[in-house]
Amino acid sequence: MSVCSSDLSYGSRVCLPGSCDSCSDSWQVDDCPESCCEPPCCAPAPCLSLVCTPVSRVSSPCCRVTCEPSPCQSGCTSSCTPSCCQQSSCQPACCTSSPCQQACCVPVCCKTVCCKPVCCMPVCCGPSSSCCQQSSCQPACCISSPCQQSCCVPVCCKPICCVPVCSGASSLCCQQSSCQPACCTTSCCRPSSSVSLLCRPVCRPARRVPVPSCCVPTSSCQPSCGRLASCGSLLCRPTCSRLAC
């Protein structure tokens, strides 16, 4: 049996590929190039790339039929019940368990930012950080991190590891973060510059210099036994000599 052509824009109706034998006369569209029928769960609607708008939000069979083949279309995300996301093939764990759907995130029903290959990343659109903190994507990263509001951008659920991105002079955020303790814990010197966006120890003691005697945690990163440290690069290294220490 013939099917509709790919050009589906015919007034206010949608022509979908299908056999006329399976549809009633009321769903036939006369102005199509060939005879075709609309699915029984869809009402006449503008063409949405082979996606017809469900009749009602409570019509779960309609959502399953129209949304599952292409769950990322705008027709599904705007008209379907939450079952559209829950039944999605992108990442069910992201669409089903994430508490960010209504609270502070944009609809992430199978958008490209939602269905990451490794882990799901909710898209936050408000100042509140409760979305990422309560997310089930990576609890260790999103729940325990104190950086959401204070000095870091939301970094919930990065594919490999959560790296806080700090802005400002305070390093307390990353020091207490559970994302990367080895990277963000303090060294023997405090950061002398906030040029680097990555919170990492920017001070290292000079070679063959005892740490207790030559690297004192002062705000200026000045060793107790020598001159001011050279802070031209991202790593602030004490410049005291071996004899001075």
UniProtKB/Swiss-Prot annotation:
Pfam families: Keratin_B2_2. In the hair cortex, hair keratin intermediate filaments are embedded in an interfilamentous matrix, consisting of hair keratin-associated proteins (KRTAP), which are essential for the formation of a rigid and resistant hair shaft through their extensive disulfide bond cross-linking with abundant cysteine residues of hair keratins. The matrix proteins include the high-sulfur and high-glycine-tyrosine keratins. This is Keratin-associated protein 10-12. InterPro entries: KAP. Keywords: Keratin, Repeat. Belongs to the KRTAP type 10 family. Residues 36-218 are annotated as: 19 X 5 AA repeats of C-C-X(3). Interacts with hair keratins. Restricted to a narrow region of the hair fiber cuticle, lying approximately 20 cell layers above the apex of the dermal papilla of the hair root; not detected in any other tissues. Sequence repeats lie at residues 36-40, 41-45, 62-66, 84-88, 94-98, 104-108, 109-113, 114-118, 119-123, 124-128, 131-135, 141-145, 151-155, 156-160, 161-165, 173-177, 183-187, 188-192, 214-218. GO terms for cellular component: cytosol; keratin filament.
